[in-house]
Amino acid sequence: MAGGPPNTKAEMEMSLAEELNHGRQGENQEHLVIAEMMELGSRSRGASQKKQKLEQKAAGSASAKRVWNMTATRPKKMGSQLPKPRMLRESGHGDAHLQEYAGNFQGIRFHYDRNPGTDAVAQTSLEEFNVLEMEVMRRQLYAVNRRLRALEEQGATWRHRETLIIAVLVSASIANLWLWMNQ
């Protein structure tokens, strides 16, 4: 789990904070939204203490020597395929077994881990990360929609002002023409 989604979540929070700091200084609402999202993330981390304890137990036991290989040693030319997590097998460990595939790939063996706790912790932290990411995207979409609505209202206001100015100029021109013709 070291180097997994919590690091990505922290990076995302930092990039959002930096983005807001480089943006307009008058956008206090966005600062509040980001602060609220960071607080929500810390609360979700605090609420998952039970999951963290499971993770610490897994790290302290003999099965902790197995690590997730999230960045597999594959060349980057493979395209947009996501790396598949693999478990390293500890020699002489009783809960990992080998299963032979009887087909075209005779002799190839697949390693499986029978420790569901590790998978459950990884799955729940990914779900928390996805929920947090969706919440951030929803807030950003709301902010973009609010800005767009404000710009549309501003454009409508300018059109009304332009129409009013043109009407005043046309009336003044007609009045000047009438006065000129009467002299």
Curated annotation (Swiss-Prot):
Molecular function in Gene Ontology: identical protein binding; ubiquitin protein ligase binding
One BP annotation, GO: negative regulation of mitochondrial calcium ion concentration
Effect of I34T: In fertile and infertile individuals
Record annotation: effect of changing A10V: 16% of the population; infertile and fertile individuals
Coiled coil feature spans: none
Mode of membrane association: Single-pass membrane protein
Key words of the record: Apoptosis, Endoplasmic reticulum, Membrane, Mitochondrion, Mitochondrion outer membrane, Transmembrane, Transmembrane helix
Pfam families reported for this sequence: Miff
Segments crossing the lipid bilayer: 163-181
Region called Disordered, residue ranges: 42-66
Cell location: Mitochondrion; Mitochondrion outer membrane; Endoplasmic reticulum membrane
Tissue: Testis-specific in fetus (aged from 6 to 11 weeks). In adult, expressed predominantly in testis, with some expression in lung, heart, kidney, adrenal gland and whole brain. Highly expressed in certain types of cancer tissues such as hepatocellular carcinoma, colon and gastric cancer. Weakly expressed in normal pancreas.
Any single Gene Ontology cellular-component annotation: mitochondria-associated endoplasmic reticulum membrane contact site
InterPro entries registered for this protein in UniProt: FATE1, Mff-like_dom
Function: Involved in the regulation of endoplasmic reticulum (ER)-mitochondria coupling. Negatively regulates the ER-mitochondria distance and Ca(2+) transfer from ER to mitochondria possibly implicating it in the regulation of apoptosis. May collaborate with RNF183 to restrain BIK protein levels thus regulating apoptotic signaling.
Subunit: Interacts with BIK and RNF183. Interacts with IMMT/MIC60and EMD.
Name the record gives this protein: Fetal and adult testis-expressed transcript protein
